Structures are given as C-alpha cells and as structure tokens.
From Swiss-Prot:
Protein name: CTP synthase
Positions annotated to bind UTP: S13, K188, T189, K190, P191, T192, Q193, K224
Gene symbol of the encoding locus: pyrG
InterPro entries: Class_I_gatase-like (IPR029062), CTP_synthase (IPR004468), CTP_synthase_N (IPR017456), GATASE (IPR017926), GATase1_CTP_Synthase (IPR033828), P-loop_NTPase (IPR027417)
Residue numbers binding L-glutamine: Y54, G354, L382, G383, M384, Q385, E405, R462
Residues where CTP binds: S13, D148, I149, E150, K188, T189, K190, P191, T192, Q193, K224
Family of the protein in this entry: Belongs to the CTP synthase family.
Binding site for Mg(2+): D71, E141
Organism in which the protein naturally occurs: Bacillus cereus (strain B4264)
A Pfam family that the UniProt record links to this protein: CTP_synth_N
Reaction equation(s) it catalyzes: UTP + L-glutamine + ATP + H2O = CTP + L-glutamate + ADP + phosphate + 2 H(+); L-glutamine + H2O = L-glutamate + NH4(+); UTP + NH4(+) + ATP = CTP + ADP + phosphate + 2 H(+)
Leader peptide range in chain numbering: none
Length: 535
C-alpha cells in the first residue's frame, strides 16, 4: 500500500520545507523506494503562471506543461524524477474543480461546503499523485505556515487521511524555527512549542519535528522539545544552515531521519546507499577553480526568480571542478556607456527568460557586447529573442527591429506571436508550455553539446522567431541550429564567427541535475572557462 508523508511548517515561512521534503525523498529513493512528491499551495491563483517573480520566484515548468512552484525544481534536482501537473495543487485549482462539479450537478443538489467537498477534493489530489506514478511513498509539502487561514482546509484534509487509511500509512513532519537571540545569547524553543500546539489543536500530532537553526541544538533542548511536543527525542531533527543545499540529505541521514520514517511506516527497505551523493557533496565543497558569469536580468533583486538558472550553472561547473560565481547585473542599469564596466570582468554572459519591455534595451546592449567582444553567451527564451533582434539591428541594419510583444508597431517584427496565439485573450495557462522536440543541425555548437539529432526540452513562451527574416540573417552568419521537426519554429540560434554564442527558445535550466548537467549549460561554462584561461 502507498504510504503518505506530509510536511508542514510553523513559526515563519521560507524555512526550507521544500529542501527537507526533497532531501527525505532522495534518502527514500536510495533505499529502493519509488517516491513521488507534490506541493500544495494555499493561494487562490490557479497556478503561479501569471504571478510576478517578485511575489513567487521562478515558475517551474514540468514536462506536461504545468506552471508550478519553484520547489518542484528542488524536488526534481534532488530526487532526479520528472514531475507532472499533479505535483502542484493550489486552492484555486481545488475550488475551480469543485465549482465545475457543482455546475455539472455532481453533488446532486446538495449544499457544497468546505467539509466535505473541498477537503475531499484535496484528498483526491493526494491519492491521485500516488496512483498516477505507482509510488511506494508520496511526500506532500503544505505551503505556508500552520495558523494561516488559507491552509486550514489542507490541514483538515491531511488530518482525515490518517483516519481513512490508518496511522501506519501516514506520517506528519513539522518544520519549525528555533531562533537565536544574540542579546540574550540563547536559543528559544517557545515559538516551536506554540507552533506544534497550534498543529495539535487542528488534530495533527507530528511524528518528527525538524528544527531550523543557526546554532547546534543541545541534547537538553531536544529533550525539552520532545517533552512539550509529545514526540520521541530521536525524532527532533536539527537542520543547521548548510554550506551547500546538497549536503542536507546527508545531515538528515546522520540523524537517522529516514530510518525513523521507515520504522513508523513499516517499510523494511535496506539503508540508503549515499556513496555517490557523498562524493558529489565532497566535490562541491572542494572545487579548485573559479569562473565568473554575468546574469543580466530584470528580477535580480530576488534571486529566486532565476534559481534553476543558477543551479544549472553550478551543476555545469561541478563537471569542471569549477565554482561558478554569478555576477548579478540589473538589465535596467545597462547602457552602451557602462556595459564594459558592468560585464567586462566576467568570463561569460547569460540573458535569461522574462516577459515585458522593462530592461530589454539593457539586455540587448549586453548581448551586443558579448557578440562583438567574442565573450561566450547563452540566451534563454527572451534572451534568444533579443539576440535575434540585436543581430537584426546591428548587423543587418534593420533600425527599429523589435518584438511585436515589446513594440506592436515595429517596422521589423523579428519576433512575433505564434500563429495559434493570435486570438488568445487569457494570459493564464495559454502559453506554448511543456516538452517539445527540437531537431539539431550537424556541425553546430548545439549539436556538439547534445551529440544527438533530436532532443526534447521544456518551453514557456508565446512569441517566436519570424521566419520571413531567416534568409537575410543566415546570409550574414546567423545560424538556425535547432528547429521544430517540421522546420517551422526556430528553437536554437548561433553566430558563426564566434567562439560560443548560443541561444535557445526553450528553458534548458529546468532539466539540469547536480550529477548530470544540462548540455548547453555544460558547454557554455566550458567556453567561459576557456575564455578566462585565454585572457
């Protein structure tokens, strides 16, 4: 029978529930269990697709085209699985589904209420995740903190699941904070006690408490927490700030967290073999070289907006025993006069995805600098579109060339709406989303990176390269190295007389893994290292 683990949070948000859940998933997977994982977000948006990155961080896209929470990126990178649309559930999705059923008459004229209708829908999403993946273990992270009004239906639903399927099949893990008061020189357990008290008042008794802390937690403090929270002392797990995220599974294993979980859920799988993971962490901690890459974006104040890009750069660096330092460059501040000052000390330049016109001209200036000065360049989504516009303006001399997204009246719409998007009015969930094939041209940097004729990558865009400009740009050394199999859509572009200038319409960062870097990132970092060594 499938086992269910629920991870809740208390005291404050952003405690690392997602990393805890992902780390436990990795430990259980290495015990030979089939693990899947999901995130429940209590906000009323149907998905984060139309939310500002300042509000929510990056939007992580799954193979099947779901726009989801950035925690799913952590889940995929840690557990090395490809998640799906069932892996992220929001209050908006739940209510939308229930209201549609009510309109269809599925409730037989009954009064539709939070209990049982909303809670039943939530439970169905938990069970469906296990059914769809044939998982041995389903880990579900509940977003927000205990005590939030928005979280109450989710907490009630996961409370009911224990009654539905039995205590041996359900486990509750609660993540809290033990703050260190500098003035008093001591750590305080009271916020954790109150958080657990709140959780218990809702009918949920945690089986494990994971305490986030800056300082070591003494045995006396663990005993105190165990006493007040009514759990075994061994089930108080310390989550100290780690030098690398990938060390967290090893820290949890040292404290026997996965064994406690298996004992409770009556799983007799052998201990997790973390030899390869330990080797990875040791490698990450002992990188001997450095390279610096400029990330020119418009959300640089909130680095979570580009979290998968940064992780993909790091993964690529691990292959070369290199620590990739990211220099954050606000695209709005970049001008032709100061671009050298802002990016001249870097070994490579990356322009990530985005929407809208803010910061676009600064990104184009940075792209021009990379092209003219032979600096390795990787463009992603909007970065690919702007690389095309820069080339059209400055090489073909098409003054005013632009994207119809940015300037609907441009005389040269190098980037234009996909034909199927012309009559679309809704913004949410209407992009070209998910996994699509890309055919690579031989003897190109893209082909050399993948070494395969056809690859599959995840997309999230509404606009596309305008094919009427293909012949003129090709004549000037602009290479269309990746297209859709029918040749209609441009997927990857390159520049001929350049050491490494590649840009992709898709989002290669979404499929990178710490032990298996994404090919374009791998070769981009290699080119950046070569550039540094040649200076």
């Amino acid at each position: 029978m499938t086992k269910y683990i629920f991870v809740t949070g208390g005291v404050v948000s952003s405690l690392g529930k997602g990393i805890t859940a992902a780390s436990l998933g990795r430990l259980l997977k290495n015990r030979g269990l089939n693990v899947t994982i999901q995130k429940f977000d209590p906000y009323i948006n149907v998905d984060p697709g139309t939310m500002s990155p300042y509000q929510h961080g990056e939007v992580f896209v799954t193979d099947d085209g779901a726009e989801t929470d950035l925690d799913l990126g952590h889940y995929e990178r840690f557990i090395d699985i490809n998640l799906n649309k069932y892996s992220n559930v929001t209050t908006g999705k739940i209510y939308s589904s229930v209201l549609q059923k009510e309109r269809r008459g599925e409730y037989l004229g009954g009064t539709v209420q939070v209990i049982p209708h909303i809670t039943n829908e939530i439970k169905e999403r938990v069970y469906r995740s296990g059914r769809e993946t044939n998982a041995d273990v389903v880990i579900t992270e509940i977003g927000g903190t205990v005590g939030d009004i928005e979280s109450l239906p989710f907490l009630e639903a996961i409370r009911q699941i224990k009654s539905d399927i039995g205590r041996d099949n359900v486990m509750y893990i609660h993540c809290t904070l033990i703050p260190y008061l500098k003035a008093a020189g001591e750590m305080k357990t009271k916020p954790t006690q109150h958080s657990v008290k709140e959780l218990r008042s809702l009918g949920i008794q945690p089986n494990i408490i994971v305490v986030r802390t800056e300082m070591p937690v003494s045995q006396d403090m663990k005993d105190k927490l165990a006493l007040f929270c009514d759990i075994d002392t061994k089930a108080v797990i310390e989550a100290r700030d780690a030098d690398t995220l990938y060390a967290v599974p090893l820290s949890l294993q040292e404290q026997n967290m996965d064994q406690i979980v298996c004992d409770h859920l009556k799983l007799d799988n052998p201990a997790a073999d973390m030899t390869e993971w330990t080797a990875l962490v040791n490698k990450v901690r002992n990188l001997s070289k450095k390279t610096k890459i400029a990330l020119v974006g418009k959300y640089v104040e909130l680095q979570d907006a580009y979290i998968s890009v940064v992780e993909a750069l790091r993964h690529a660096g691990y292959s070369f025993d290199t620590d990739v330092e990211v220099k954050w460059v606000n695209a709005e501040h970049v001008t032709a006069e100061n671009v050298k000052e802002l990016v001249g000390d870097t070994d490579g330049i990356l322009v990530p995805g985005g929407f809208g016109d803010r910061g676009v001209e600064g990104k184009i200036v940075a792209i021009q600098y990379a092209r003219e000065n032979k600096v390795p360049f990787l463009g992603i989504c909007l970065g690919m579109q702007l690389a095309s516009i820069e080339f059209a303006r400055n090489v073909l001399g098409l003054e005013g060339a632009n994207s119809s997204e940015i300037n609907p009246d441009t005389p040269y719409a190098i980037i234009d709406l996909l034909p199927e998007q012309k009559d679309v009015e809704d913004l949410g969930g209407t992009l070209r989303l998910g996994l699509y094939p890309c055919k690579l041209a031989e003897e190109t940097n893209a082909y050399n990176a993948y070494n395969e004729p056809v690859v599959y990558e995840r997309h999230r865009h509404r606009y596309e390269f305008n094919n009427q400009f293909r012949p003129d740009m090709e004549k000037e050394g602009f290479v269309f190295s990746g297209t859709s199999p029918d040749g209609r859509l441009v997927e990857i572009i390159e520049i001929k007389d350049h050491p490494w200038f590649v840009a992709a319409q898709f989002h290669p960062e979404l499929v990178s893994r710490p032990n298996r870097p994404q090919p374009l990132f791998h070769d981009f970092v290699r080119a950046s290292i070569t550039n540094k060594e040649s200076k």
